[in-house]
């Protein structure tokens, strides 16, 4: 598995438009993409700093994992995403190391990335997402 860099930091928010005001207007970070990811029951807004992205996440339903996160911990940093060269190879390597994954097979996330999440129990408390860029 080769880590290519930090792809984005995922931030759970109650209101995308309210949060967008800070990231887009105050910090003047370029908004590049808005997308609903139905499989994860979230709506996203992505801001690109040219050295990594900020992904704002808000729930689309009350049974969304982002909704549960906000209810339990409040808005804030949800996960760190690392880009990998090969998601399937990464999954095999992580399983060999007995790393706990939240999904055994890659899902399609925002921007078409193939994604898998690593349980915080395996990372010292941080939810880590691995993502392979679409070809």
Predicted region positions:
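N-terminal beta-strand motif that seeds the catalytic metal site of vicinal oxygen chelate
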Residues: 1-18, 75-84, 134
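Amphipathic alpha-helical segments
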Residues: 17-30, 94-97
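C-terminal "cap" of GNAT-fold acetyltransferases
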Residues: 37-53
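Short secondary-structure junctions
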Residues: 27-36, 99-105
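Vicinal oxygen chelate
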Residues: 1-2, 45-48, 82, 91-135
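Short, structured motif recognition centered on aromatic/hydrophobic residues
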Residues: 6, 10, 23, 47, ...
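A short, acidic/glycine-rich surface segment
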Residues: 32-33, 63-68
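Mid-chain, well-packed structural core segment of small domains
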Residues: 69, 73-97
């Amino acid at each position: 598995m080769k880590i290519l860099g930090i792809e984005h930091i995922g931030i759970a928010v109650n209101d995308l438009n309210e949060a967008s005001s800070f990231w887009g207007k105050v910090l003047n970070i370029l908004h590049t993409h808005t997308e609903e990811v139905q499989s994860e029951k979230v709506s996203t807004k992505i801001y690109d700093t040219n050295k990594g992205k900020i992904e704002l996440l808000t729930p689309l339903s009350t049974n969304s994992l982002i909704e549960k996160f906000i209810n339990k911990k409040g808005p804030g940093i949800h996960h760190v995403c690392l880009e990998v060269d090969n998601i399937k190879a990464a999954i095999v390597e992580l399983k060999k190391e007995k790393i706990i994954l939240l999904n055994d097979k890659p899902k399609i996330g925002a921007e078409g990335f193939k994604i898998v999440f690593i349980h915080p129990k395996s990372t010292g408390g941080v939810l880590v997402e691995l993502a392979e860029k679409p070809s």
